[in-house]
Structure formats: structure tokens, C-alpha cells
Amino acid sequence: MKKKIIISLISIIILTIPLFILVQNNLENSDEIIAKESLITYQSNLEEKFKIDGYTIDNPNIILDPYDASPLTALVLFETNDEVEPTITIVGKDELTTYTYESKKSNKHYLPIYGLYADYENTIIIEYGDVRKEITIKTNPLPDNFILPTSIKADKEKLSNDLYFFTPSSRGYTCAYDTNGDVRWYLTNYAIWNINKLKNGHMLVSTERLINAPYYMTGLYEIDMFGKIYNEYSLEGGYHHDYYEMPNGNLLVASDNFNSDEGTVEDYIVEIDRQNGNIVKKFDLKSILNMEDGKSENWSSYDWFHNNAVWYDDKTNSITLSGRHQDAVINISYETGNLNWIIGDSTNWSSEYQKYFFKPVGDNFE
């Protein structure tokens, strides 16, 4: 029995719909908006190639990298007389790297093909009813500057046929590897920090544009596995490190307030309304914590907290954040922004914050 593909999204710092752009109302740089609308228009124009009339399973329309953004993907288009539900198999080098999934029932078929090998004659099997069609898709090599794993270790008895997604924290490619360490998906557009699957099946990645050095990006793209952009969320304070999709669909985003009097970074959280792109809530950590407390080795007055994680807990209606430069994990109320608790070493913290620290219990703590 063929396994269904399970796509596991892993983010390392160490999937026709109208196209539109959601931008923050007070974004000042209109040139950036125009530039990105042009890219979305470019992708929309590419859909003119997605012709299906007259194509059959014996002579399908095969489009490699349909949105010019994800070279190891393809689109296979054809018509059938009756409504059928095709099964697609991307043949791998073994069972764990072979992916099988079903398409929707229709007589007009736009079959997404994900997980091709680079520089390879990929075999794709399409089946429905008594029909079995085998097609070959030849891909191009990886870019010369694509950094590959130097050592691969896998306990395959404990693995399933997943794709494992990676993002860089600086330069590199957002990509996915199979259990053999072969690249099976990547984006040509520069995207860093987090990558997660949204509830609607799309993914969220950074834009490719810097708003401030060294790694503060202008915002986030909502994309699918083709790299097709559905929405852009632009932020006046940019985006870095992490975001979280809330139960209502809004996004909590690690951001910055570049206009603050203190001139600090990585101490600001915003909530984006997914329907219109507006900022509906802000959390300024400077009003919650003492900037001079809990200094780690890399602490500076400019980057005093260095928030690198955002998490929302629905049960307690609270937000958990990770401050590398204060060596602390903190939790605040979503409603009020008040501090709830701190995990870390309380030694170098002011007396007013001592009551918020959890007390270690047991022999495992020093």
C-alpha cells in the first residue's frame, strides 16, 4: 500500500485564487509596494501558459516551475471525459523517498507535482480507474551556490516518507530534503527565518527585501509550494526570527519599532489582522521589563532582549517570548501585556522581578 505524503515543516536558525496584497496602511515606501505588485502581476501573467483545452492524459500540458519560483515543482494539465480522481506518484530512489497523493475529482485536471529531484529525469505516475500513465520530467541542476549536506545520518526504521523543510538565518536557500538528504524542493527567492504551514495549507515565509540591516525583512509572504504569492504582509517595523498563527487566523510577529526614542531592536511584537493587513495590537517589551536586567554576554543597549521566538497559548490567553540577551523566557498577558512569569536565572535581576521567576525543584537543577 502506497504511503501518503506527509509534509513536515521544520524551521532552522542554526502549499485559480485571486491575487492581492495586504499592506500596512502607514507603510511609507510606496516604491516597494509597486515593485511587489509587479512580481504578483508577473506570476499572474504566467498563468496564461496554463492551457488545458485539448490536452489529454496521453498528451498532457507539462509546465516545470509554473510560477518561476520553485524549480523542483511542476504542473500537469489535461482533460478527461468523465470526472475522475487521479492519484499522483513521484517515484523516489526508495520507498521512503517516493511520494503518493490524490487530486480532487474533476474532468479538468491541474495536478501539482512537488518533490522532484534536481538535474534528474523524474518519473511521475498518474493513475485513475484502469488508466496508468507514466511521464518523465527533466529538471535543471541546483544553483552553483547551493550548499549541500556534507554528512547524512538517518535511522530509517524510525522515519516516514516526509520532506524536511529548512530556512537560513542569513544567506542560503529555503529548501526541503528527503530522508536520504537529497534536495526535493527549494525557493529561488531569498527567504529567511521561519517557515510554517498555515491552517489553510499555505506557508508563510519572509519577503526577500531588507528594511534594515542586518536581517530585518520588510514583512511576510503567504505562498504555496509553487512559490505563488497569495498575500504580502508589510510591516513598518519589519519582521525577524519568528511568527505565530493565532486561533482567529491573525499573526503575532516578532518586529521592531525603529522610531522609538531608545533606538532599540528585537523588543517589539505586533498582531496583524489577516483580513486587511492592519496592525491591531502592539507589545513593547521596554514597558514590561527592565532593559538593564539579566545581561548575557551578547547584551547591548541596542539589542538588549533579542526576542527570537513567539508563541500564543489559547488556554491562558498569553504570549511566550524568548530573550536571548536576557537569558530568559517570559510570558505576558495577551489582554493587558502584563508580565506573568519568567524562566531563567534570577541572580542579576531587579528585586521587583524576583516574584515572577519559577523556582527550580529537584536534583536536576543546580
Give the role of each language-model region.
Residues 22-30, 129:
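Beta-rich interaction/scaffold domains
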Residues 37, 56-90, 109-110, 114-121, ...:
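Histidine-/acidic-rich catalytic cores in large beta-rich domains
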Residues 27-67:
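Short, compositionally biased P/S/T/A/G/V-rich stretches that sit at domain boundaries
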Residues 14-24:
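Hydrophobic alpha-helical membrane-insertion segments, chiefly the h-region
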Residues 100-106:
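Short beta-strand segments within Ig-like beta-sandwich modules, predominantly Fibronectin type-III
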Residues 89-97:
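Extracellular low-complexity, O-glycosylation-prone stalks/linkers
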Residues 1-14:
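N-terminal Sec-pathway targeting helices
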